């Protein structure tokens, strides 16, 4: 059996609020293999967003280990985590987080700038991914010229553009049309 794509062991995440410590994640163990689809479900306040932030390398655990694609990311510094996020993780946010005065093509190509691709490589790959989500005819439109479902598909295309190891999506089908 191949190494898991994600392996977290005894992950804990605490937050200090004034004089109080809030124990949000209390020793989570999880393994996700390549090709698996996993849904995090639970009531509000159960720690889903906190776990997603840890899995997405947007936060680090209070304790425990997180191995992502063979690399221990649990103790990495911010600049190392930024590189991991750009290369390994695609995000689809519930609110899309698209740049409002930027075309769909440029919104999708944005992560490739940070990955060091040339403008021609960015445009070619972003065009390819926008075609995959059936938005070839809307590439030059800004977000306010797109429906909610089209904006969601731009966000999905942006998550896919760097060919990440994992996709983290917050309610990814909530606005599709």
Functional labels for PLM-detected ranges:
Residues 4-177:
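ABC family nucleotide-binding domain
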């Amino acid at each position: 059996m191949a190494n898991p794509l994600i392996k977290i062991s005894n992950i804990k995440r605490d937050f200090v609020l004034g004089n109080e410590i809030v124990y949000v994640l209390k020793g989570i163990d999880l393994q996700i293999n390549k090709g698996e689809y996993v849904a995090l479900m639970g009531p509000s306040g159960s720690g889903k967003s906190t776990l997603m932030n840890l899995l997405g390398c947007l936060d680090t655990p209070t304790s425990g280990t997180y191995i992502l694609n063979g690399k221990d990311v649990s103790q990495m510094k911010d600049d190392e985590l930024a590189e991991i996020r750009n290369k390994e993780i695609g995000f689809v946010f519930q609110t899309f987080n698209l740049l409002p005065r930027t075309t769909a093509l440029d919104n999708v190509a944005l992560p490739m700038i940070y990955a060091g691709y040339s403008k021609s490589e960015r445009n070619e790959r972003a065009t390819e991914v926008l075609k995959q989500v059936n938005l070839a005819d809307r590439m030059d439109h800004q977000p306010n010229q797109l429906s909610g479902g089209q904006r969601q598909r731009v966000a999905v295309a942006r998550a896919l553009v760097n060919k990440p190891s994992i996709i983290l999506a917050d309610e990814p089908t909530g606005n599709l049309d």
